[in-house]
């Protein structure tokens, strides 16, 4: 199983039935799988905080949700996480393509890449950083369950080395 297949299968096997996403080159194959899957409702959004809001509404309507995004959008989401998700105890599995840390060629990605883990810690979102597809499959399922139990988001950070398993 390659990197994208592991993420997709773990989402399915976690019982997630509603996904929002923001476009990302690393996540594009996963997003294509989700678009083709009739058992999962996939709603592309234009901004990450919009995804937080849509996932919140879906959760309140009885759905099990996930948000797929690039780490550059984490900063955009902080207010929605603090004022909506934390206050109303909304579990969301957040799968983040972590740019700006390893092998990054776009200098504008580097600051957020360096701050991502600290931001997650500041807003008290637990996170896991799997290195292989098998590890990602297990940790995504664990993170989804933890999110439900905590009634709060849990994140998966997928760095550049992880995505090399798609090649």
From Swiss-Prot:
InterPro entries membership: Sulfopyruvate_deCO2ase_alpha (IPR022502), THDP-binding (IPR029061), Thiamin_PyroP_enz_TPP-bd_dom (IPR012001), TPP_dependent_decarboxylase (IPR051818)
Protein name, entry field: Sulfopyruvate decarboxylase subunit alpha
Its taxonomic path starts at: Archaea, Methanobacteriati, Methanobacteriota, Methanomada group, Methanococci
Task: Report whether Lyase shows up as a keyword of the record.
Answer: yes
Q: What is its EC number?
A: 4.1.1.79
Gene Ontology BP term (one): coenzyme M biosynthetic process
Task: Give the record's subunit note.
Answer: Heterododecamer composed of 6 subunits alpha and 6 subunits beta.
Where is the chain membrane-spanning?
Answer: none
What's its job?
Involved in the biosynthesis of the coenzyme M (2-mercaptoethanesulfonic acid). Catalyzes the decarboxylation of sulfopyruvate to sulfoacetaldehyde.
Entry superkingdom = Archaea
GO MF term (any one): thiamine pyrophosphate binding
Family recorded in the similarity comment: Belongs to the ComD family.
Note the coiled coil stretches, chain numbering: none
Alphabetic keyword roster: Coenzyme M biosynthesis, Decarboxylase, Lyase
SUPFAM superfamilies associated with the record? Thiamin diphosphate-binding fold (THDP-binding)
Q: Please tell me the species this chain comes from.
A: Methanococcus maripaludis (strain DSM 14266 / JCM 13030 / NBRC 101832 / S2 / LL)
């Amino acid at each position: 199983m390659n990197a994208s297949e592991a993420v997709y299968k773990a989402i399915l096997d976690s019982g997630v039935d509603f996904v929002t996403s923001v476009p990302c080159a690393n996540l594009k194959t996963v997003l294509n799988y989700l678009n083709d899957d009739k058992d999962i409702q996939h709603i592309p959004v234009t901004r990450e905080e919009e995804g937080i809001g849509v996932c919140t509404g879906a959760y309140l309507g009885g759905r099990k949700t996930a948000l797929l995004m690039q780490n550059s959008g984490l900063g955009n989401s902080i207010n929605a996480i603090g004022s909506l998700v934390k206050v109303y105890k909304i579990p969301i599995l957040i799968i983040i393509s972590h740019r700006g840390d390893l092998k990054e060629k776009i200098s504008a990605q580097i600051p957020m890449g360096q701050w991502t883990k600290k931001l997650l810690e500041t807003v008290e979102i637990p996170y896991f950083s799997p290195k292989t597809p098998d590890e990602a499959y297990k940790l995504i399922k664990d993170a989804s369950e933890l999110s439900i139990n905590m009634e709060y988001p849990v994140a998966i950070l997928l760095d550049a080395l992880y995505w090399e398993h798609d090649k």
